[in-house]
Amino acid sequence: MQSGGGGNGGYTNGRVRAIIGAKIFGKELIRLFFDTHAHYDDEWFDGDRDELIASLPAAGVELVVNCGCDKKSSEASIALAERYDFFYAAVGWHPHDARTWSCESADLIRAWAMREKVVAIGEIGLDYHYDKEWKDTQFEVLEAQLCLAEELDLPVIIHDREAHGDCMDHVRRHPNVRGEFHCYSGSAEMAKELLDRGWYLGFNGSITMQGARKAVETLKLMPSDRILLETDCPYLAPMPRIDGRRNDSRKLKRVAEFIAEILGTTPELVAQTAMENGRRFFGIA
């Protein structure tokens, strides 16, 4: 599963941009991070949203994709993307919100997809941790959105919690759909199939937590050109949570440091490679 460049998934011969600005990793680097999965529309940010977002570029954050979960949050994601130059939007129905899918939802996604800064359909998928009794509804809503992704030629962002087998069945039924499994928690074997299909895997603060053994082992085997960094903020702040439970894009630095230690490379190279991967995945020049 290695892709060029020898060990550590091809990191050894990688390239780091020389850019001066904010102090990141103890060096003069700026605009190094791409947070490929955030939820800045969440009410946890209501008290300081604008101030926090305005602070991100100086903290090294170059790009953010804000992900929708239903009609309201998808529209909020678009609004954030149209307000902030470095924000983009993904739109769709999360499995927790599958029951709010209606006959107009597909047409809404088609209309949203026409907006310049909508780059993906997401966050979509299956979740059996809380909502297994709504399994059939989740299936129908995921299937509808995968069909839309193929129709609209947009990548998908998959939420997969305790539903690995069924999520993979949906992926196999749509070989022309490209996508990413965010907050990857599957096996190395599942990762290999996804990578063989051209998919990407997203990693966030959950990889720093106890019980993340499968994600760590998967990372060790992955080609570097399929790794995406994300926060899922305001959730899943990396450990140790010395500055509180609320997550934000500035904490990608700690995720990059953790991954670099696993792979035997530098945090700068992890961040820069993930930046290039994210731009390629979402089609952002």
Name the predicted role of every residue range.
Residues G4-G6, Y11, R15, I19-A285:
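Mid-domain alpha/beta scaffold segments of enzyme catalytic cores
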